[in-house]
Amino acid sequence: MPTIQQLIRQPRAPKKRRSKSPALQKCPQRRGVCLQVKTKTPKKPNSALRKVAWVRLSTGQEVIAYIGGEGHNLQEHSIVLVRGGRVKDLPGVRYHIVRGALDCAAVKDRKQGRSKYGAKRPKSKK
């Protein structure tokens, strides 16, 4: 343990925080181009075919991004908007694709939680 005199001479350095989404380089979102659109299987105990895309960002980095919602229209060369946010049961997937932005269409017939999937408010019947 250091003495008070040693701490006066050289104070304690604060711990550096590592970013959870370094490829975005401190931006809220980044534009990218889909290289591949595939499915991945989650970790135990879950079972599914989760839709993911390999995306080359405008920074030049390649990341794996999750495509949320039911159904999508993405294919190779689609331009997408990528935000941070990991998928807990998919190792290595630390980014999400923003639905309803650029080439990625919104989820059809979405009634609740629409803002997360880019869906417009449905017309009310009178």
From Swiss-Prot:
Provide the GO MF annotations for this entry. Answer: rRNA binding; structural constituent of ribosome; tRNA binding
Question: Some GO term, biological process aspect, for this entry: which one?
Answer: translation
Gene Ontology CC, one term = small ribosomal subunit
Q: Which Pfam families match?
A: Ribosom_S12_S23
This protein's name: Small ribosomal subunit protein uS12
Q: Where is this region: Disordered?
A: 1-29
Residues with the 3-methylthioaspartic acid modification: D89
RNA-binding listed as a keyword: yes
Q: Where are the transmembrane segments?
A: none
Main role?
With S4 and S5 plays an important role in translational accuracy. Interacts with and stabilizes bases of the 16S rRNA that are involved in tRNA selection in the A site and with the mRNA backbone. Located at the interface of the 30S and 50S subunits, it traverses the body of the 30S subunit contacting proteins on the other side and probably holding the rRNA structure together. The combined cluster of proteins S8, S12 and S17 appears to hold together the shoulder and platform of the 30S subunit.
Q: Give the record's subunit note.
A: Part of the 30S ribosomal subunit. Contacts proteins S8 and S17. May interact with IF1 in the 30S initiation complex.
InterPro entries cross-referenced by the UniProt entry: NA-bd_OB-fold, Ribosomal_uS12, Ribosomal_uS12_bac
